[in-house]
Swiss-Prot record:
Compartment(s) of residence: Secreted
Leader sequence residues: 1-27
One record GO biological process: growth hormone receptor signaling pathway
CDD domains the UniProt entry points to: somatotropin_like
S-S pairs: C79-C190, C207-C215
Alphabetized Pfam families for the sequence: Hormone_1
Molecular function GO labels: growth factor activity; growth hormone receptor binding; hormone activity; metal ion binding
Family under the similarity heading: Belongs to the somatotropin/prolactin family.
Modification Phosphoserine occurs at: S132
Function: Plays an important role in growth control. Its major role in stimulating body growth is to stimulate the liver and other tissues to secrete IGF1. It stimulates both the differentiation and proliferation of myoblasts. It also stimulates amino acid uptake and protein synthesis in muscle and other tissues.
InterPro entries membership: 4_helix_cytokine-like_core, Somatotropin, Somatotropin/Prolactin, Somatotropin_CS
GO cellular component: extracellular space
Protein name per the record: Somatotropin
Length: 217
C-alpha cells in the first residue's frame, strides 16, 4: 500500500491526470513544450507507481517469499522489451536524443496496450487490484502524450512510428494454476520495469531541456 505522502501527491494531481491530451493540445494550442513534458512525466510516474504497487501486492498475495528470488532469475522474468536497443538507466539515456527516447518510450507503451486491455478481468474479484480497470486508459493517455511531444519536436510532421510486431502475452485468468500465477508474475514484473524505463526517459528529457534544480532521481 502506498505511503501517505505519495498518495496525497497523487490526489493533488488527480485533476491534471484526468484531463485528456486532446483537450490540452486542442483547446490550449499555446501550451508550452515544458508543459507537455511535465504532463507526460506526471502520467508516467503515476503509471509506474501503479505498476509497482500492483506487482508488490501480487507478489505478497500469491508468491511465497522463499521462491521470489529464484523465479526472478528464470525465463519467466525475461522481458522481451529487453531485446529493444533501449538505454538501461539514466546515464545511458542521456546519450540518446529526445526523439530517440520518445520513440523507444512509444514502443514500450505500445507493447502493453493489448495485454493490459483485459487486466481488470484477471483481478476482478480482488479488492487489492481495484485500480487495474483504468490502467489501459491511462496507458493510452500516455501514448497520446508521447505522440503529442513527437509532433512538437518534429514540427508537426512526425515520421511513421515503428510498431512492435511482437507484444506481451495476455494475462492468464486462471489464477488457480501455478503456471498462470508464474506467467502473470513475470508479466507484472516486466510491466513495472518498462514503465520505470519510460518514466526515466521522460524525466531525462525534461531535465535536460529545462535545467530544473530538482532533476535528481
Amino acid at each position: 500500500m502506498m505511503a501517505a505522502g505519495p498518495r496525497t501527491s497523487l490526489l493533488l494531481a488527480f485533476a491534471l491526470l484526468c484531463l485528456p491530451w486532446t483537450q490540452m493540445v486542442g483547446a490550449f494550442p499555446a501550451m508550452s513544450l515544458s508543459g507537455l513534458f511535465a504532463n507526460a512525466v506526471l502520467r508516467a510516474q503515476h503509471l509506474h507507481q501503479l505498476a509497482a504497487d500492483t506487482f508488490k501486492e501480487f507478489e505478497r498475495t500469491y508468491i511465497p517469499e522463499g521462491q521470489r528470488y529464484s523465479i526472478q532469475n528464470t525465463q519467466v522474468a525475461f522481458c522481451f522489451s529487453e531485446t529493444i536497443p533501449a538505454p538501461t538507466g539514466k546515464n545511458e539515456a542521456q546519450q540518446k536524443s529526445d526523439l530517440e527516447l520518445l520513440r523507444i518510450s512509444l514502443l514500450l507503451i505500445q507493447s502493453w496496450l493489448g495485454p493490459l486491455q483485459f487486466l481488470s478481468r484477471v483481478f476482478s474479484n480482488s479488492l487489492v487490484f481495484g485500480t487495474s480497470d483504468r490502467v489501459y486508459e491511462k496507458l493510452k493517455d500516455l501514448e497520446e502524450g508521447i505522440l503529442a511531444l513527437m509532433r512538437e519536436l518534429e514540427d508537426g510532421t512526425p515520421r511513421a512510428g515503428q510498431i512492435l510486431k511482437q507484444t506481451y502475452d495476455k494475462f492468464d485468468t486462471n489464477m488457480r494454476s501455478d503456471d498462470a500465477l508464474l506467467k502473470n508474475y513475470g508479466l507484472l514484473s516486466c510491466f513495472r520495469k518498462d514503465l520505470h524505463k519510460t518514466e526515466t526517459y521522460l524525466r531525462v528529457m525534461k531535465c535536460r531541456r529545462f535545467g530544473e534544480a530538482s532533476c535528481a532521481f
